[in-house]
Each structure stands twice: as C-alpha cells, then as structure tokens.
UniProtKB/Swiss-Prot annotation:
Its main location: mitochondrion. Residues 1-21 are annotated as: Disordered. It is found in: Mitochondrion outer membrane. Keywords: Acetylation, Membrane, Mitochondrion, Mitochondrion outer membrane, Protein transport, Transport. The keyword Chaperone does not apply. Belongs to the Tom6 family. Residues 1-20 have a biased composition (Low complexity). GO terms for biological process: protein transport. Forms part of the preprotein translocase complex of the outer mitochondrial membrane (TOM complex) which consists of at least 7 different proteins (TOMM5, TOMM6, TOMM7, TOMM20, TOMM22, TOMM40 and TOMM70). The modification N-acetylalanine is found at residue 2. This is Mitochondrial import receptor subunit TOM6 homolog. InterPro entries: TOMM6. One of its GO terms (cellular component) is mitochondrion.
Amino acid sequence: MASSGVTVSAAGSASEASEVPDNVGDWLRGVFRFATDRNDFRRNLILNLGLFAAGVWLARNLSDIDLMAPQPGV
C-alpha cells in the first residue's frame, strides 16, 4: 500500500513537471504543492542549498562589520 502511494505521488510530480501553468493561480498552486510535499527530495535539496547560499552570503557580507568600533555621532 505504501509503495502504491509513492508511485501515485511520483506520477503526480512527473505530470506536474511537464505541464505549463496558464496563469498565476496555477503557478502559485504548483509552488504551494512543491513547498508542502513532505516526500519531495528536490524540495529538500533546493531548500537546503538555498539556506546554505543565504548563510554564505550573510557570512561574507557581514564579516567586515566591526561591532566594537566607535560609532559616528555617539
């Protein structure tokens, strides 16, 4: 029974990938389904890579700020 559920969700993902949304509502619905699918490896991979990239960007751009330096006008 579990394998049939996986097959159905995999088939649903494959058919979704081949469809082209005709309006913004369909696109948003697809994004919502993509973000809330708990068994989606692609979602986890994209989310983890995005969070990693955001962390790297923050670390690179905030590392040169000296919080102990005297502030102007204080």
